[in-house]
Structures are given as C-alpha cells and as structure tokens.
C-alpha cells in the first residue's frame, strides 16, 4: 500500500502534482534544486527538500526524502550538451540511492520524443529506433529505471506540455513561413499529466509503459494559428507542407479506463481565455 510519495522535481508539473496527491491524503516529500523555492513547497503543505542530482545524489536529509513507498522522477535532461551528456550518470546515481531506501515503486516521467518522426502512428509497442542524441539518452534512462532490482517501475511518456503558464500560442505568435504546417501535433494538458500519474498509482499499473498524449491531433497550422491569436492577438503563418511527424497513440492507458480531461485540443483552446 502506498502512503508516502516523493516527487523529485517540483517544477511546472511536479508542484501541481504534489499538491494534487496531497489532497488525496498521501504524505508528500517534494524536492527542488533551488533554495529559493523551498518556502513555496512548504507553504503548500509539502515537506520540502533541497536535492542536487549529479554523479551522486546530494542534499540535506536525503535518506528522509527517500523514506517513502513511491518515488516519482520528474527531471528531464538539461538543454545544454554537457547537462544532457550527464543525464545517464545522474539516473544511474539515483538508482543506487533508490536501492538503499524504502522505495518499492517508481514512476519515471519520460517523453514521446523517444519515438522517431516516421510519418506513422506510434505506440508503446514500437521499436525505439531514433537517431536523435536526446532520444537515445531518454531511452537509456528508461532502461536504467526498468532494470532496478526488486523495484516495480512504470514509465509515462508525455507529449508536449500545455496548460497554466505554458500557453501554446507563445511558441509561434507573430512568426511567418513556419514549416510543416500540415503536420499533426502531439500535446497533453497539465490536468491529464497529473490525471494519468494518479490513475497509474490508484490502479496499481506497475511494470508498464504508457503514452500520455491527447487523443486529438489537429494540424500544426490550425492549432497554433488559433493559439497565437488567443495568446496575444498576433498571427502565426505556416507553410502548407507536411514535414517529418508522428502521431502518438495513447489508447493503451485509455483501455485501462483512463478518461482524458482535455481530449479535444481545439475545443480546449477555444475555451481558453485570451492572454
């Protein structure tokens, strides 16, 4: 039975997730790499911890942070080359600490970027043949997590993230000649990121891999043109061409009974107030 949960990485997704889990009566530890964010975590009723993940895991009261039943790992690779190169070492170091702890289960937040843009629909059964260095690093991280001895782990591959303070219109507002306007989008709202994670926990869906992407895939041209207008009233002009793309299929988690809160991305966008 899961009573205590640690959220490693209380950022845009991690903090709302921790708050939602707390509201469901779980005891929550939350980590950040920034001392300035500790008061925010504490003010939400979450036990705050300053944790740095490098070639070894460091932080005050590290054993106390990991004294939980479930660890949710929400730490994507850094954007710089050096940060990304260290990602495998960071995940490996983390697994060493997991094995010393009371942790029984792990949820690893991955990305649909592990799938190649091969002009087809992709699901969890696909071979992950992707030449992108970033994808290779994430695939390797998934493998490391899945191989931790005596730990039940589930990987959730999230699509592009949208929601509060992450309005999709900000990406292309006012730009012109944007390529691949006829390619479909793969996105997921924050509410469904949290919803899928909680669904996995509540239904004991362990030793699995699930995609997290809204079941609707509007064209990039249609979605981001409307998003840009809703964001600041400016236009985004796309080229009417199909570039490299994929359509991420999330029917596996739906088949288990999950119902998306925002299945229709265009409908969500229409209902979103203008920024």
Q: What residues fall within each predicted segment?
A:
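Glycine/proline-rich active-site loop of Rossmann-fold NAD(P)-dependent oxidoreductases
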Residues: 139, 162-175, 199-210
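N-terminal Rossmann-fold NAD(P) dinucleotide-binding loop
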Residues: 14-15
């Amino acid at each position: 039975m899961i009573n205590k949960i640690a959220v490693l990485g209380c950022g845009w997704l991690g903090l709302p997730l921790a708050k939602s889990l707390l509201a469901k009566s779980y005891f929550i530890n939350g980590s950040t790499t920034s001392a300035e964010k500790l008061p925010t975590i504490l003010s939400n009723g979450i036990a705050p911890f300053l944790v740095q993940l490098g070639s070894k895991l460091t932080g005050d009261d590290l054993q106390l942070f990991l004294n939980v039943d479930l660890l949710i790992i929400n730490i994507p690779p850094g954007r710089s080359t050096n940060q990304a190169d260290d990602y495998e070492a960071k995940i490996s170091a983390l697994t060493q600490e997991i094995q010393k702890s009371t942790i029984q289960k792990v949820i690893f937040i991955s990305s649909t970027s592990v799938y190649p843009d091969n002009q087809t629909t992709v699901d969890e059964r696909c071979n992950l043949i992707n030449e992108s260095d970033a994808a290779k690093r994430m695939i390797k991280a998934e493998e490391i997590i899945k191989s931790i001895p005596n730990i039940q782990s589930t990987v959730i591959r999230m699509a592009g993230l949208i929601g509060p303070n992450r309005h999709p219109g900000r990406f292309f507002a006012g730009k012109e000649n944007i390529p691949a306007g006829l390619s479909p989008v793969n996105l997921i709202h924050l509410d469904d990121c949290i919803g899928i994670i909680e669904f996995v926990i509540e239904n004991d869906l362990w030793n699995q891999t699930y995609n997290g992407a809204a079941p609707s895939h509007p064209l990039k041209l249609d979605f981001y043109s409307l998003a840009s207008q809703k964001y600041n009233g400016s236009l985004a002009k796309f080229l009417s061409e199909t570039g490299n793309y994929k359509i991420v299929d999330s029917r596996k988690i739906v088949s288990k009974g999950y119902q998306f809160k925002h299945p229709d991305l265009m409908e969500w966008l229409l209902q979103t107030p203008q920024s």
